[in-house]
Amino acid sequence: MIRRVSTTSCLSATAFRSFTKWSFKSSQFHGESLDSSVSPLLIPGFHVFHCPDVVGIVAKLSDCIAAKGGNILGYDVFVPENKNVFYSRSEFIFDPVKWPRRQMDEDFQTIAQKFSALSSVVRVPSLDPKYKIALLLSKQDHCLVEMLHKWQDGKLPVDITCVISNHERAPNTHVMRFLQRHGISYHYLPTTDQNKIEEEILELVKGTDFLVLARYMQLLSGNFLKGYGKDVINIHHGLLPSFKGRNPVKQAFDAGVKLIGATTHFVTEELDSGPIIEQMVERVSHRDNLRSFVQKSEDLEKKCLMKAIKSYCELRVLPYGTQRTVVF
């Protein structure tokens, strides 16, 4: 159980440390994403922390932010039962003049060393470069179109470096015109069972921070994943761990399910088995046919993928063991 407490000012850390799992949100923000319009002088930042669990972690982190004039607006903590591990994510506002960006990194790094942290990441969206991503897809492009439109509207906090596909697209299509208009390169790399063109893909995605498989119907090899060395996020048109592999919508339809779903997960060497980031479902019935299953699935896929990417960029997603995630 997570204990949720409301506060309007900086943490009183010692009062909360007795809870093993708790979080709080400033009532002023109602749990929404932080906005730099709060003050012309204050800007938002995020910090995630993962370390062995000991007394005093929350106090040290909150004191660090308060000492620099920052104000914590949201703090989430997760401590699994019977495991000596601690996860946290804080949202705060601060004055970058009083707390320079480089100094912030140094301050949190000092705490990370003190607690032998496995991970300590800080992000200030208005000061840090946007995450650079590449998109991979096959024939179906509904997820790509959704991402491009959200990106154009400023609702996807990334820079799209390129789009890679194993299907050729005519130059006069909506997707190709959009990419050309925004200066995003499109690379057609046909694949076969014997040649997945992975070396060429690796060359194109150099310099990206993570990859998004927006319905890319090819299995990436272990060598590719090791060569890339960063996160790869996939949207699967089924509710994992059920209905893995090809045509999961048809599998679900034939099974007579009453809930259809979509799953966003990290890619691993095993097909459709990586840690799950986000899942969404919608009810179906005996009145649905395969065509309506597909339409509902595509709507879910777009929403599920967008939410997962947004959560990832806001440092809400942390690995938990080998097969699970913590999503704050």
From Swiss-Prot:
Tissue-level expression: Expressed in leaves, cotyledons, roots, seeds and flowers.
Main location: mitochondrion
Catalytic residues in the record: D272
Residues of the ACT domain: 46-129
Database matches in SUPFAM superfamilies: ACT-like, Formyltransferase
Entry EC no(s): 3.5.1.10
Record-linked InterPro entries: ACT-like_dom_sf (IPR045865), ACT_dom (IPR002912), Formyl-FH4-Hydrolase_C (IPR041729), Formyl_transf_N (IPR002376), Formyl_transf_N_sf (IPR036477), GART_AS (IPR001555), PurU (IPR004810), PurU_ACT (IPR044074)
Protein name: Formyltetrahydrofolate deformylase 2, mitochondrial
Organism, scientific name: Arabidopsis thaliana
Organism taxonomic ancestry: Eukaryota, Viridiplantae, Streptophyta, Embryophyta, Tracheophyta
